Amino acid sequence: MRAFAVAIISIGLSAGLTDVQAQSWQPSRPITMVVPLSAGGSTDVIARIMAPGMSKVLGQTIVVENVGGAGGTIAGARVAHATPDGYTFAIGQWGTNVATGAIYSLSYDLMKDFEPIGLIATQPFLIVARKSMPADNLTQLIAWLRANDNKATAGNSGVGSPSHIASVLLQKAVGVNLVMVPYRGAGETTQALVGEQIDITLNTPAISLGQMSAGQIKVYAVTSKQRLAIAPNIPTTDEAGLPDYYFSFWHAFWAPKGTPKAIVDKLNNALVQTLSEPATRTKLVDLAQEIFPREEQSPKALRIYQQSEIDKWWPIIKAANVKSE
């Protein structure tokens, strides 16, 4: 990961909170962390890893609430229109806070209607298939997909999700048309794969490695340039026969637009302190997460990074003709 040049961004105070009140803000009731996807996926898992540490720093309970549906846009609208007082913020990721803007007609603006809090970590996917898939390596899987053009099914976590866009790019790289099957999150997609209701999916190491060890699925490659430290036996896509196919996605926190800078800074401090805890770092690394360096965990760095990702990916997504329905 690279360091990002950042610009100073002034953030106005929300109505009803003075400078002094914001500076001295100490939460007096539970804080809600909105998760824009269903339980069981990597976004939910990361949220539940981060919440206890941030609660400790802030001195108040953080309640994790899953608000799934429509690629995360239901949760996005809720947080965008929430009272900007520090008691509601969201975890999001590349799909919910980049890709959705190129696919859905949103009631909010991804860059203008949120205050960035900070980046957390990034991770690759694993290319996985149902247990009964008659392919023992990625080359054989690609041959099977080509032989089953327009019939092979690819599950994903919802339209515009990282797994959906990664599947769209996979079919382009392989030269086939996959039947896309959207679910309400990675948890449901995983259940469908284990239940052999779909042929393949792209899923996170955090979810897939357990099923691989239990013999419930087949794993073919990791979508990164390097092998995973926690699973060095899994080849990269380059090594497995699909050169130049890479995909990773990241997670971060956002607050509603107008949340006072002093409160955003306190939430960011809770993020930074939690990510500095060895126990938290170990849990994330064990899930194949690459934690962003300290200098890239600031609100300003997230704003710059998110905009750069929008500039990079929107043309690709639109060119792929990805639709919300």
Residue positions per predicted region:
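An extracytoplasmic/periplasmic, membrane-proximal ligand-sensing/linker region
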Residues: 28-30, 261-325
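Hinge/capping helix and adjacent helix->loop/strand transition within the periplasmic-binding protein
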Residues: 81-87, 102-188, 200, 237, ...
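Beta->alpha turn/N-cap motifs
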Residues: 91-96, 156, 186, 203-208, ...
